Regions:
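Terminal, low-structured helical/coil segments at or just beyond the last alpha-helical repeat
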Residues: 290-335
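Amphipathic alpha-helical repeat scaffolds of TPR domains
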Residues: 44-67, 93-123, 149-169, 191-205, ...
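Helix-turn-helix repeat elements of alpha-solenoid scaffolds
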Residues: 23-33, 71-85, 128-138, 169-182, ...
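Bacterial N-terminal signal peptides that target proteins for export
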Residues: 1-7
Length: 335
């Protein structure tokens, strides 16, 4: 749960970086029913389909209000257990609106973890079934893609979920190979900003399944596409593009090249995610395992520039490396 929570927090930070100015409105039952009529009469009204899909998820998960950055504010278990929540499930099950399906699916997956955390912090006798919600979320996004296979937005919703299902989710788990098969298909559809924002996900997973040529192509494209330092994803692109190329070099026994890419990754300007959660330490760990302590120590010093919220971890790791011990990088091997 902790790792899933971190993934959701990263998504929240991404949303904030994208500067979504208006919070999503949590609608009443009557308002949702009126919106259903609107969407039925105007199937091309994407904004209404988006709002309806998200509010379907809010009923299923019992979300009564949202706070800053659209995080769960309050829960109402009776809302999730009511007749209208069952109506919502039925509507999702028979919907032919890709927008409603994709938006409800993405919201169900995202908010299920927030609901789990909320229920842990605010225990009540009534529990909301988040497992069923996550399963429905996966199914809904898959159906949206089958209805509109060329819509890139739906693919960007699915890619992070596929990776989570292959890493730490107990909901419809996948092997990394299975996940990469679908991620590669999704990437083949994406263009422009949608593709740019997913390249690091695809590159990291390609390394994991030893598809090194694919990983290199994604990483090179990521670096070449990073031309605007004002873009919220610029720092991530510099970091992960170089990290993946370093991982590939190391797997191909080019240790000096791998070290150069490690140090290049550490020169990133940072990003909302890197500044909060810190860097992925996979390449650093791999180089430590080959005895390359000095390069890793320099890299850790580089990371101090952007990771001010490390709570002493960079120094702790440096001390352990200097003592010839392998640090426990924990969740910094997953980001």
């Amino acid at each position: 749960l902790a790792v899933r929570q971190i993934a959701i927090l990263a998504a929240v930070i991404t949303a904030a970086a994208n500067a979504q100015p208006q919070p999503t409105e949590v609608l009443s039952q009557n308002q949702v029913q009126q919106l259903e009529i609107t969407v039925e009469r105007n199937p091309g009204d994407r904004a209404s389909a988006t709002l309806l899909g998200k509010n379907y998820a809010f009923f299923i998960l019992g979300i009564a209000s949202l706070g800053r950055f659209d995080r769960v504010g309050t829960l109402d278990p009776e809302k999730a257990a009511g007749n209208f929540a069952q109506h919502v499930r039925n509507e999702i099950g028979k919907s032919v609106s890709a927008g409603v399906l994709a938006e409800s699916g993405q919201a169900l997956w995202r908010y299920a973890t927030e609901v789990k955390v909320y229920q842990t912090l605010h225990p009540t006798p009534a529990k909301i079934d988040t497992t069923a919600a996550e399963t429905l979320g996966i199914q809904s996004i898959d159906r949206a893609i089958s209805l509109e296979p060329d819509e890139g937005t739906w693919r960007t919703y699915r890619i992070p979920i596929l990776i989570q299902r292959s890493s730490f989710s107990r909901i419809k788990p996948l092997s990394a190979t299975e996940a990469y098969r679908d991620v590669k298909e999704d990437m083949s559809v994406l263009t422009g900003t949608n593709r740019y924002n997913m390249l690091s996900h695809a590159a990291k997973l390609a390394v994991k399944v030893s598809e090194l040529d694919d990983a290199g192509s994604y990483a090179e494209e990521l670096l070449k596409s990073s031309t605007d330092a004002r873009n919220w994803n610029y720092g991530n692109a510099i970091y992960f593009g170089n990290m993946v190329l370093g991982q590939i070099a190391l797997r191909r026994s080019s240790i000096d090249t791998a070290k150069a890419y490690l140090l290049a990754s550490g020169k990133t300007l940072g990003s909302p995610q890197l500044n909060s959660f810190g860097p992925n330490m996979s390449l650093a760990k791999d180089l430590l395992e080959t005895g390359e302590r000095q390069a890793v120590l320099i890299f850790l010093d580089e990371c101090r520039v952007f990771w001010k919220m490390d709570n002493g971890r960079l120094q702790q790791w440096a001390d352990q490396v200097n003592s010839d011990r392998m640090p426990d990088f924990g969740s910094n091997l997953l980001y």
